[in-house]
Each structure stands twice: as C-alpha cells, then as structure tokens.
From Swiss-Prot:
Gene, per the UniProt record: GH
Gene3D superfamilies for this protein: 1.20.1250.10
Protein name: Somatotropin
Signal sequence bounds: 1-25
Residue pairs linked by disulfide bridges in the UniProt entry: 77-188, 205-213
Any GO CC annotation of this UniProt entry: extracellular space
Molecular function per GO: growth factor activity; growth hormone receptor binding; hormone activity; metal ion binding
Keyword tRNA processing (UniProt): no
Protein function: Growth hormone plays an important role in growth control.
Binding site for Zn(2+): 44, 197
PROSITE patterns from the UniProt entry: SOMATOTROPIN_1 (PS00266), SOMATOTROPIN_2 (PS00338)
Family the entry assigns: Belongs to the somatotropin/prolactin family.
Major subcellular location class: secreted
Keyword annotations: Disulfide bond, Hormone, Metal-binding, Secreted, Signal, Zinc
C-alpha cells in the first residue's frame, strides 16, 4: 500500500512539473500535496539556478579569482535588507504566513532581472535554460499564492509588500567588471532560492509531522 501511494505521489509531481498550467492543473489538491508540489518545484528551481551559476563560473570566472569574487560581490545581497530569517532557529520561530510572504518577496525580486536576462542572453550557452528558470519562478510564485489562500481562509491580501528588485545583469560579458557583477547576482539568486526551498521544507515538515525538521 505504501509503495503504491509513493508511486502515485511521484507520478503527480512529474505531471505537475510537465504541465504548462502548473498548480492550476490540480485545483482540488490537498494541502499536503500542495506543499509537496511546492517543495519539489523549489528544489528544482534552486538546482537550475545552481547549475547556471556553476556554468557561468566555469565559463567566465578564472579559477584564481573565484573565491575573491564570491567574497567581494556576494557577501551582501539585497535580500539581506528584509527581515527574512537566515538561520534555522529564526526560521522555526516564524509563522507559515510569514515564511510564505518572505518567499514571495524573494521570488518577485528576481522576476524582472531574469526576464531581461532571458531576452538578452536567450541564445547564450551558459544561460540556455534561463527561460525555464523564469517560467519556474512564475509558476512557484503562483503556487505560493494558492498556499496563502489555503492557509488564510481564502483571503487574498498583498503579502508581497516588501517590494524590491535586484539590479539588471550586465549585458557586456567582455567587461571584467560586468562579468563580476553578473557573478555576484547569480550568487545572490542561488542563495535566495535556497532560502525559499528551506522555508517551504520547514513549513511542510512541521505541518505534517515529518521525522526531522532540521535543514
């Protein structure tokens, strides 16, 4: 029975990931499945961003400069200006609505920069999957709004009130300064998507009493 249930859940997630309608393809999903779907989508998005970051680093950043660039360009990200938790203790102290609100803020802060990257670098080998990254951003954003409505008795409020956006990526990849700026932005993007993934895992774990809620 457990094996059959697990297979069904995996099939559901695969269908959702492939469906162009995203979360709306399954409007009657249980809350548990909505969280499962959101977590897997966040994991997938985080991995895609991490792969893009890795490919960019290998292509444009000399090995002897990589650690220095990480420290000088990605130590500070705009997301650090919002009161989103940065460690597991603070994360567990936040309500689910707060964590969803922070997640929405992080997702929405990248919408415009990634949309521009998609237009400018769509044919670039390193940024070849950036169109899918943008689609995943929008889809997960939609899914988090659905979760908020489920948790807040159907109310639709402006939870993305902590509005900010990142700088545009530099289109001049021949410029060392431009390459370094993009490297720092990708580092922040990866860091922010890891936060979103972690917040969703914590919410799912504590709501459905999974064995280990430390991430």
């Amino acid at each position: 029975m457990a094996s059959g249930l697990g297979s069904s859940l995996v099939l559901l997630v695969v269908i959702c990931l492939q469906s162009p309608q995203g979360f709306n393809a399954f409007p009657q999903m249980s809350l548990s499945n909505l969280f499962t779907n959101a977590v897997i989508r966040a994991q997938h998005l985080h991995q895609m961003v991490a792969d893009t970051y890795r490919d960019y680093e290998r292509t444009y950043i000399p090995e002897d400069q990589r650690f220095s660039n990480k420290h000088s360009y990605s130590v500070y990200c705009y997301s650090e200006t919002i009161p989103a938790p940065t460690d597991k203790d603070n994360t567990h102290q936040k309500s689910d609505i707060d964590l969803l609100r922070f997640s929405l803020t992080l997702l929405q802060s990248w919408m415009t920069p990634i949309q521009i990257v998609n237009r400018v670098f769509g044919n670039n080998q390193v940024f070849g999957n950036i169109d899918r990254v943008y689609d995943r951003l929008r889809d997960l954003d939609e899914g988090l709004h659905i979760l908020i409505r489920e948790l807040d008795d159907g109310n639709v409020r402006n939870y993305g009130v902590l509005t900010f956006t990142y700088d545009k990526f530099d289109v001049n990849l021949r410029s060392e300064e431009g390459r370094a700026k993009n490297y720092g932005l990708l580092s922040c993007f990866k860091k922010d998507m890891h936060k979103v993934e972690t917040y969703l895992k914590v919410m799912k774990c504590r709501r459905f009493v999974e064995s280990n809620c430390t991430f």
